[in-house]
UniProtKB/Swiss-Prot annotation:
Belongs to the GSP H family. Residues 1-6 form a propeptide. The keyword Hydrolase does not apply. This is Type II secretion system protein H.
């Protein structure tokens, strides 16, 4: 009887095919769906933030607001002693470079500032577009979070002023 000393060519080819298929699946699963998943995550994060701010506004009897830009948003709170809006955190939350926000207040589209240069020009107008009141009410709004470009996916958050926003797939 003859002892076998190694693998046959067929066995090596089968292993190579299996490894190739697994690498291909790994590349596909991380490459194409990552922006879609990240968009979902950003929309859920924003909806959750609005929900938490609504609860905090009622519990602390304090007014909150969201200052929106095309590529970022920032939480503000109203300081009654100073009679102005102050940022809760030092920096605003930046969206990924492939994402952008659009905003409608009471059915009217608002033009959002886009870059830091535009923001610095309007430094005195640090008013929030979305109000979260201590009564538990919100400004009636529709916010659209989308991938830039004509084929990009878009998600929508909206509220009639009394209900918390839900994330929905937006129509292009």
């Amino acid at each position: 009887m003859r002892a076998s000393r190694g693998f046959t060519l067929i066995e090596l080819m089968v292993v190579m095919v299996i490894i190739s298929v697994l690498i291909g699946l790994a590349v596909l699963s991380t490459g194409f769906a990552s922006t879609s998943r990240e968009l979902d995550s950003e929309a859920e994060r924003l909806a959750g933030l609005i929900g938490v701010l609504t609860d905090e506004a009622v519990l602390d009897n304090r007014e909150y607001g969201l200052r929106l830009e095309r590529d970022a948003y920032q939480v503000l709170r109203y300081d009654e002693a100073k009679a102005r809006w102050l940022p809760v955190a030092r920096d605003s939350h930046r969206l990924p470079e492939w994402a952008e926000l659009t905003f409608e207040l009471d059915g009217q589209p608002l033009v959002l500032a886009g870059s830091k240069g535009e923001k610095e020009q309007k430094k005195g107008t640090d008013q929030p577009q979305l109000l979260i009141l201590s009564s538990g009410e919100l400004s009636p709004f529709r916010l659209r979070l989308a991938e830039r470009g004509p084929e990009g996916r878009a998600l929508s958050l909206s509220s009639d002023g009394f209900r918390l926003p839900r994330v929905e797939v937006a129509r292009r």
